[in-house]
Swiss-Prot record:
Cofactor: Zn(2+)
Cofactor remark from the record: Binds 1 zinc ion.
Gene Ontology annotations of biological process type: negative regulation of DNA-templated transcription
Stated role: Negatively regulates transcription of bacterial ribonucleotide reductase nrd genes and operons by binding to NrdR-boxes.
Record's keyword terms, sorted: ATP-binding, DNA-binding, Metal-binding, Nucleotide-binding, Repressor, Transcription, Transcription regulation, Zinc, Zinc-finger
Pfam families linked to this entry: ATP-cone, Zn_ribbon_NrdR
Similarity comment text for this entry: Belongs to the NrdR family.
Protein's UniProt name: Transcriptional repressor NrdR
PROSITE patterns (UniProt xref): ATP_CONE
Signal peptide: none
Residues annotated as transmembrane: none
Natural source organism: Salinispora arenicola (strain CNS-205)
Length: 154
């Protein structure tokens, strides 16, 4: 790593630590030429391929925004939404792919959102799965009821 002070082409790693829930690695470095220290941050880039074929970086902020819209007017706090977004990011990063289709991000949102708030889940699913009729909603509600009964909640 090039020293930002003297431009020496090499440096020594003094310390490495994980940051941002393990998504980043912060390295403290020392330059053997001038002796100054500096910090670098490394992050594995995760790209999302949209339906149009356009690729963009994964954004936890976009997840939070979409889930927040689905939760509007519901008793769901910002901390719960942030935790859900973190779970989604961990799930998609665990797949080990550098790129993944936006469809997989949506699927990763549905499970945790269903556990968080069923009404918000229905709102999100209706957009994500392009519900076109009441029958689509009824089918999804029946699936939720069946799952609740299976878990012993109904």
């Amino acid at each position: 790593m090039r020293c930002p002070y003297c431009r020496h082409p090499d440096s020594r790693v003094v310390d490495s630590r994980e940051a941002d829930d393990g998504q980043l690695i912060r390295r403290r470095r020392s330059c053997p030429e001038c002796g100054k220290r500096f910090t670098t941050v490394e992050e594995a880039v995760l790209a999302v391929v949209k339906r149009s074929g356009v690729t963009e970086p994964f954004s936890r902020t976009k997840i939070i925004g979409g889930v927040r819209k689905a939760c509007q007017g519901r008793p769901v706090d910002d901390d719960s939404i942030a935790l859900l977004a973190q779970k989604v990011e961990e799930t998609v990063r665990a797949k080990g792919a550098a790129e993944l289709p936006s469809h997989e991000v949506g699927l990763a949102i549905l499970g945790p959102l269903r556990d968080l708030d069923e009404v918000a889940y229905l709102r999100f699913a209706s957009v994500y799965r392009s519900f076109e009729s009441l029958a689509d909603f009824e089918r999804e509600i029946e699936t939720l009821r069946t799952a609740a009964q299976t878990r012993g909640g109904g």
